[in-house]
Amino acid sequence: MSEIPSTIVSKNMTNDKNSLESMNISSSSSTEENPKKQARKNEEHGPDPSANPFHLSGDVDFFLLRDQERNKALSERQQQKTMRVHQKMTYSSKVSAKHTSLRRQLQLEDKQEDLEARAEAEHQRAFRDYTTWKLTLTKEKNVEPENMSGYIKQKRQMFLLQYALDVKRREIQRLETLATKEEARLERAEKSLEKDAALFDEFVRENDCSSVQAMRAAEKETKAKIEKILEIRDLTTQIVNIKSEISRFEDTLKHYKVYKDFLYKLSPKEWLEEQEKKHSFLKKAKEVSEASKESSVNSTPGDKGPGIKGKASSMWAKEGQGTKKPWRFLQTMRLGRSPSYLSSPQQGSQPSESSGGDSRGSNSPIPPTQEDTDSDGEEPQLYFTEPQQLLDVFRELEEQNLSLIQNSQETEKTLEELSHTLKHTQIRMDREVNQLKQWVTTMMMSITKEEDTAAELELKARVFHFGEYKGDQQDKLLESLNCKVLDVYRHCTGTQQEANLGTVQMLTIIEHQLDELLENLEHVPQVKIEQAERAKEKERRIRLREEKLQMQKILQEEHLQRARARAQAEIKKKRGRTLVCRSRPPAHRIKQQSEHTLMDKEEEELLFFFT
């Protein structure tokens, strides 16, 4: 019996060896074939990325995973576009579908594993029980004699195989326990996921309900807000309209107040004094009545806080007086009546501007009666009842203003004339005084100089002309000099009357005027001098042109006279042969100087005055 298991074990070992050898051969052949295939793949698809040490593997390449996820999302989106409405799913349904599909896959895998394990167990059991097959296999084989070392080796191999089987069984048991634990954990996770999905669905439903309620509440609030905004707009438009009416009424009140002040100013003083007396009488009567009322109120017993009631009544009375007038004013303006008799109690009277003042009421101050009547609420009385009265007053004022304007214009004209004449006379007198002063100084200086020169000349004459004095020749020369100096003096001063001055005095005056002219010429700006020079040059050119034209006319007349004389002269008949042009000798032209030399007026004046 011991031989049979040993033979069986040896056979099993040989079978295992054969199977291992076949596996090694197949693996070696596959390894030999694999490099060829890899070389072909490398030739077809390029170098292997695993050869690069900096290359990420396929399961760690984030960029590749991102591209895959993006492509997957795009494909799902395209698929969703092509799908119908009833085929599409929400996110929660997708998640639940994924969970269910995973669960089904796991269940199918578990079933397949169970079936495979059962099939393997049945196969092993049938193989162990099939002893006849084992006997038939081992019956006809030659059993070789075994040694102790071979036996030990076989036992050792059996032990190793048994140990390997035990290790594998323990590992299988451990993996089974881990699988059961993992299944339990997956079941718990599945249950928790189902609970979470249910809670999430409930939360989504509650959120939808709350969002619907919030939308309804928001719609109600928006409707109420829009209604309130419309009401506010209507009220603001009404307020703006009322404010515009109030401002318009205030403007009209201001205008009417100005008109009233103007009418009060135009009214006579007697009427104003009478109105003031009447108003003072009414005021005194009112004060007496108020004092009697206060005494009666203070004397009545049983009233608590009479002072407070009196104050409240006075306050209510003031408010009634303040609010009564604008309300009455608005009513009158709406009815179309002209509220010319009303005025604002809070606004001051504005001054009215008038062209001229009336002697009766224009200069008189505004009486206090108008303010009091306004405060009392009574209609103010006016002196003017018809517009014709105002027109008459305006006509009188206009006549007075016209007469005053004429008088003022005449007085202004006379004042201007008097001031002008006074100024001119003052300037002329100042100029004459200065001139006389200068003349006095020059005369005194010239007298001293002349006395010195006379003394010197007398001394020289006595020295050089001792015994050779000719009085007649000296007198004639002095008379000619005196005539020339007088002519120059008249041209310089512009006086045609005969002066009773001596030659020396006339020469000093001429010299003084020449100095003044030179000084004035220095003070005159260069532009004016240039303008005067241009004007002089222009006059000179015009004069030269005129003289040239006259000379041309004279020459033309002479030419005409010569032509006329030539025409009237007898015709001379030519005799002999006419000279040819080539044999005609050249005519000798003699240059004749023109006798008509033109001299400029300025040169004549220079020659006359300075030679």
Swiss-Prot record:
Location in the cell: Cytoplasm, Cytoskeleton, Cilium axoneme
GO terms of biological process kind: cilium movement; inner dynein arm assembly
Keyword Coiled coil on entry: yes
Coiled coil: 101-128, 164-203, 230-257, 393-432, 526-578
Biased composition (Low complexity): 20-32, 338-357
Any one Gene Ontology cellular component term annotated for this protein: ciliary basal body
InterPro entries linked to this entry: CFAP_domain-containing, DUF4200
GO terms of molecular function: dynein complex binding
Coarse class of the protein's main subcellular location: cytoplasm
Function field: May play a role in ciliary/flagellar motility by regulating the assembly and the activity of axonemal inner dynein arm.
Name by which UniProt lists this protein: Cilia- and flagella-associated protein 100
Species whose genome carries this gene: Homo sapiens
